[in-house]
Amino acid sequence: MNTYTVKASDIKRDWHVIDASGRVLGEVAAEAAKYLMGKHKPMFCRNLDCGDYVVIINAKKVTVTGNKLDQKIYYRHSGFPGGFRQEKLGDLLKTKPLFVIEHAVKGMIPRNTLGAQILAKLKVYEGEEHPHASQTGEVSKES
């Protein structure tokens, strides 16, 4: 019996639209990561980028559970002395909701060059309008 090896030419990429309005941040990120990596496909292969494109709409309307809006803090450093900055999740959701979702999905993707390729297929938009209407089909409102 021969083992089937997936080739890059065998991979067919679909487009998935995820509506984040009223959904929990982690659930949206987990669903997006699953589609991006291709884990929903029977031909999933860890050493190839076999995932699909993912469009997340209504990023501004994503929710979080518990007291995370006040207690979860995102850290960054500019690299200069005194350049340490921290922001609460609630403030970031008001100013940069796209960053919050991209950061959550990035944490669920492998940290290597293939992960960078995978993350490039993620498209996040604040509202319902997106320029990928011709590629995408129906909207996934729940996982």
UniProtKB/Swiss-Prot annotation:
Keywords: Ribonucleoprotein, Ribosomal protein. One of its GO terms (cellular component) is cytosolic large ribosomal subunit. GO terms for biological process: negative regulation of translation; translation. GO terms for molecular function: mRNA binding; structural constituent of ribosome. It comes from the Bacteria. It holds the Pfam family Ribosomal_L13. InterPro entries: Ribosomal_uL13 (IPR005822), Ribosomal_uL13_bac-type (IPR005823), Ribosomal_uL13_CS (IPR023563), Ribosomal_uL13_sf (IPR036899). PANTHER family: LARGE RIBOSOMAL SUBUNIT PROTEIN UL13M, RIBOSOMAL PROTEIN L13. Belongs to the universal ribosomal protein uL13 family. This protein is one of the early assembly proteins of the 50S ribosomal subunit, although it is not seen to bind rRNA by itself. It is important during the early stages of 50S assembly. Part of the 50S ribosomal subunit. NCBIfam families: rplM_bact. This is Large ribosomal subunit protein uL13. It comes from Dehalococcoides mccartyi (strain ATCC BAA-2266 / KCTC 15142 / 195) (Dehalococcoides ethenogenes (strain 195)). The lineage of its organism: Bacteria, Bacillati, Chloroflexota, Dehalococcoidia, Dehalococcoidales.
